[in-house]
Amino acid sequence: MKYGLLQENGKVAEFIQIKTIMKNVIANVSTAITLALMILWIKYPNRIEWEAIIGILLVIKEVTIRWQIGKIESLEFSPAISLAHGYVNNFLEPAINELLMKASNNINFSIYIPHDLEELSDQQIDRMKLQIEANGYRLKEIKLKKKTGRPHDLLLVEKQEGTLSYFDFPRTLLSLQSYIDYKVDSTKNEFSEEKKIAMGAKLVDAFHNEVDRLIKKKNLEGIVTFVSKDLELY
């Protein structure tokens, strides 16, 4: 599991680096254009109405920069969407295929969707397991034999004999913490913690929506359900 988280942390770090490079390139190009126009204005002051032209070009430049930065900022949820694709393609679908090969009937696979990333800590997951057991379920951790792209254990949940459900905590989401820290710390203020919680919730929601979309695309919606902290279905 740690190996998988290291892989996902690498993806998030790579995204942050690319985003920073893109912003720097835009800033450098815009500065170069401005300097070039100013030099031409100084060198040939009387040949063209430089003041009007530079004014228009600076407005166009500003609009273009804002548009490009807007496109970059729209990528804010890309790390969560990338994690969703990795989770479904490298773990969820192979895991379901393996379980279906073993099961004599249909299976139910539940994915836990947290309200915030702290719910995926070891301590909170342990408390969640106790809550599930308190509701009359028997729990058993099982290991998948086939390669699913990353080491991963599943929680087998049973209430009545022969009634089985598989439960997973998508801890791959924890790798988003470094991205959240980067985004919030770059504008650090007294509301940083609140911003981190709010951003974490938005990223979890983006992950959930993309996983749901991929599940429907792969015709797995009859097998997979989502549950929240209160064990209610989404």
From Swiss-Prot:
GO BP term (any one): defense response to virus
Major place of residence = membrane
Q: Which InterPro entries match?
A: Prok_STING
Which keywords accompany this UniProt record? Antiviral defense, Cell inner membrane, Cell membrane, Membrane, Nucleotide-binding, Transmembrane, Transmembrane helix
Q: Name one GO cellular component term.
A: plasma membrane
What topology does the record note for this protein and the membrane? Single-pass membrane protein
Instruction: Cite a single GO MF annotation.
Output: nucleotide binding
Which N-terminal residues, if any, form the signal peptide? none
Protein location: Cell inner membrane
Transmembrane feature ranges: 20-42
Q: What does this protein do?
A: Effector protein of a CBASS antivirus system. CBASS (cyclic oligonucleotide-based antiphage signaling system) provides immunity against bacteriophage. The CD-NTase protein synthesizes cyclic nucleotides in response to infection; these serve as specific second messenger signals. The signals activate a diverse range of effectors, leading to bacterial cell death and thus abortive phage infection. A type I-D CBASS(GG) system.
Q: Which protein family is named in the record?
A: In the C-terminal section; belongs to the bacterial STING family.
Its domain description in UniProt is: The cyclic nucleotide binds in the C-terminal bacterial STING region.
Q: Which named protein is this?
A: CD-NTase-associated protein 13
Q: Which organism is it from?
A: Roseivirga ehrenbergii (strain DSM 102268 / JCM 13514 / KCTC 12282 / NCIMB 14502 / KMM 6017)
